[in-house]
Structure formats: structure tokens, C-alpha cells
Amino acid sequence: MLYEKFEYNINNLIGNFGLSKISIAVSGGSDSVALLYLANIWAEKNNIELFVISVDHNLREQSKQETHYIQNISNSLNRKHYSLSFDHQNNFSNLQERAREGRYDLMTNLCLELDILVLLTAHHEDDYVENFCLRLERNSGIFGLSSSNINWYNNIQIIRPLYNIPKSELVEYLVSHNIKWFEDESNSSDKYRRNVIRQKLAKGADYIRHRSKPAYREEFKGDTERSTAAYTSVGEEALLRGSILSLEAKFGTMSKAAIISQQLKTNKLIENELKPELISAIAEAVKIFEYGFAFLDLVKFDKFSNEVKVQIINFLLIIISGQSRAARFYSVEPILKLITQDVNFKNTLHGCIIKRIQNELLIYREFGKKLPESKILLDKSVIWDNRFCITKNQETPNCFVTHLSLEDYKIIKKQLDLEPLKNLSCKNHNAVLLTLPIIKILEKVIAIPHISYYDNDMWNFEVSFAPNFVSRFTHFC
């Protein structure tokens, strides 16, 4: 039965955490509505408080009805329901990705407020199959092709207990229990490659790997020769190690069953070999400093596999830049080639400066490119540049957090003790200093907490390096 499969999954994924409450994301579609009813049975059985969260993206008229419907279901189940709203600000560029990030920001922030550690989502078997096909078409490496049933976002654990349950079983469950759901009309549009794949697989047809239209291969602009070279230069090493991808997967057609088999093999290789290697590589070769820069030991780095090397570079770029997305492989590959040439260099990538200093790679935030916005310190704490948490320990009126300008630096230069930063950053202290948070009142710099600069003994601020790092493979609180 469906519930027994769900119960087995969720108990295995959550483990013995002794949770007293849990949250669930529900949109109104068949997948999440089925998840809500299954999770409700499980929560009731285990005496766990269930919080239902819906996000209205304000893009479809139907969304208001969906939210109202979920609220009614939640009330009937005696579960608390929270309706959140995503503001797209009439900016429709890259909307799907921004809406997804906005949705997870809203839901996980609410979880933090409610002291909830786990969020359930309704990703099912068909979603995993579609993702595998899409990533295959983008020539993803082994890490990109893998999937995970547990992810982290904003220090909230995202759990997918429907991972091995096809959509058809969820629909059958709803129909048999006379439960209605809403269909998103955009799911039937041929505008999105995902929908084309979904419709073919739903009819029992084989998946044919798409290879020609550049619209679906944006990162390579339709350049088949270039994309194939990039794919084999790094990804092939790990793929061949476990004979992960069959010839059909690389160049031909696959049935849904074959795709699931390939996905399981990929996940097994990641879990048993590459993920432990990645964690070891970060522990052995990476040093991250509270000033928001990092060093990579290239001697230790050299012993790891190419796929892991790509992940480490991207890990550092995300951490140091404060961005939420990884750099494309074809952007990282030139850096890897430069490293093998054993010469010092200085490059920019992903909002970072990458500088080789003998056997180490220094990575720090690029100053002058997309400078972070100033943040008013209204509350006790504020996150600035998606990297630093600044906390005030006293009432400080009209102060705000920003970066140090060259003009400000000239005014206070003689009062700054930069020797510790100079030593840690191998004499790159001036560049790093310009990327650190400072506190100002009007036009006056009153504090640079990282270097213990205060213009008055009454000020006291704490600062910590706390980037919102998101990864399917590693998590560090």
C-alpha cells in the first residue's frame, strides 16, 4: 500500500531525531495534496505537530483558490496553515529560478521562526527521472546527474519522502479517497523542455536525448563539439570509474526503467565514493577565514579526482561570493587548467578574485562588481552581502552596514591596525578590507568590527562569517 511505502521512507530519512513538529510544503497539485494526507496520518500516529505551508507566487489567478483550498484541508485536519506570498516585483526574467529560490527563502525563514528543523516536499519518482534527463542534456558531470532525498536550505533539512513513488500512484490514492486537487495549466505547455520529457514518459514512450537545439543547451550555445569536450574532460573520469552511463544514456534512448536504474547507480557512486572524498578534500585542503576569504592548499588538492576538484572550486566560489548558484563548468575548467601549469596567476570568476600564490590558491570577494547594498541596523542583527551577520550590542541610532569606500579608507587609514589581516591574507589585506562590513552613521565610519576599529569606546558590534551555503552534497551549520 502507498502509506506503508511512505511510512518506510520517511522513517528512514528522518531517523531517530525525536522531532515534536515538522513542516510540509503544499501547493494544491496532486503530488503535494497526497503528501499532506499521508504526512497527516504519519504525524498523528507519531504524535507530531504538522505545520502546512503554502506559497502564492502571484502569477496565476488560480493560485488564490489553491491556497484557500489548502487552508480548508488544513483546518479539517486540525493542522496550522501558513500562507506566504512571493513578490516577483514585475520582473519576469529567469522567473522560474527566482520563484523557486524565493519560495524556499520564505518557507525556511518561517521554519526558523517556528523552531522547525524539517520541511517535507512532494518530489516524486517522475520528478527525479525528469531532472536526470534535463541534466543529461546539459552534459552534467556525475555530481550534477546525482539526486538526493535529503537536502539543506537555510539550515533547514528538506526531506523528500515520495522519491520512489510514481505520480500515478499518488493520483490513484487521491481518486480512491475522493480528494480533489488543482492542475497547473503551465504543466501542459510545450514551452518547457521538462514538460516535453514528462509527456513522453507519461505515455510510456522512451526518452530520446535532445542534442540539437541550443535553447536547451544554453551554457554551450549549441556548440556540440565544445560541450562534448567539456563533458569528457572531467565528467567522464568519474562516469567510467563505475561504468555509470550506458551508451544509450550518453547518445541514444532510454526507457523510464533504464533512467531510474542509471540514477540509482549514479547515486550509489556519489554516496559511497565521491561524497566522502569531497568531504575529506574540504577538510584537508580548504581554510576559510572569518574575514570572508579562503585558501586552497594545491598540493593536497592535486590528489583528488577531477570531479571533486570542480566541486571544491564551486564550493569556495559560492561561499566567498555570497551567491546561491554555482558557476558553470565551462567557467571553472580554465581555472583547473591554470592550476596544472604551476605558475602564479590572478583571475576573476563568479564575483571572486582567484589568485595563485605559490602552492596556495587565495579566493576573496571581488570589490567593485555588484557591490552589496547598504543595510540599516534596525533590528539587533542583520545579514549583509549574504555572507556576514552583524549584531549590535547597544542602541545605536541611524546606523547602517555598508562597505568601505576608497575615500573612507584614506580618511581613517592611519588609525587602522591591519597587521593581523596582512599576515593571514599573504599581504592582500587592502583588497580584502574593502569587502568587509563597516558601520556608519551618516557619512562617518564608526566601526569596522573585523579589525577592532571603533571611533568611540561606546560602540560594540559583533560580526561573523555566515554565508547561506546550499549544497546537495555537504552541509555545515
Curated annotation (Swiss-Prot):
EC number: 6.3.4.19
InterPro entries recorded: Rossmann-like_a/b/a_fold, RPE1, TilS/TtcA_N, tRNA_Ile_lys_synt, tRNA_Ile_lys_synt_N
GO CC terms in record: cytoplasm
Reaction(s) the record says it catalyses: cytidine(34) in tRNA(Ile2) + L-lysine + ATP = lysidine(34) in tRNA(Ile2) + AMP + diphosphate + H(+)
Signal peptide: none
Alphabetic keyword roster: ATP-binding, Cytoplasm, Ligase, Nucleotide-binding, tRNA processing
CDD domains documented for this protein: TilS_N (cd01992)
Keyword Ligase attached: yes
Residues where ATP binds: 27-32
Protein location: Cytoplasm
One MF term in the entry's GO annotations: tRNA(Ile)-lysidine synthase activity
Biological-process GO terms, alphabetical: tRNA modification
KW ATP-binding (keyword) present: yes
HAMAP family assigned to the protein according to its UniProt record, in alphabetical order: tRNA_Ile_lys_synt
The record's note on its domains: The N-terminal region contains the highly conserved SGGXDS motif, predicted to be a P-loop motif involved in ATP binding.
Function: Ligates lysine onto the cytidine present at position 34 of the AUA codon-specific tRNA(Ile) that contains the anticodon CAU, in an ATP-dependent manner. Cytidine is converted to lysidine, thus changing the amino acid specificity of the tRNA from methionine to isoleucine.
Family per similarity comment: Belongs to the tRNA(Ile)-lysidine synthase family.
Protein name: tRNA(Ile)-lysidine synthase
Source organism of the structure: Rickettsia massiliae (strain Mtu5)
Gene that produces this protein: tilS
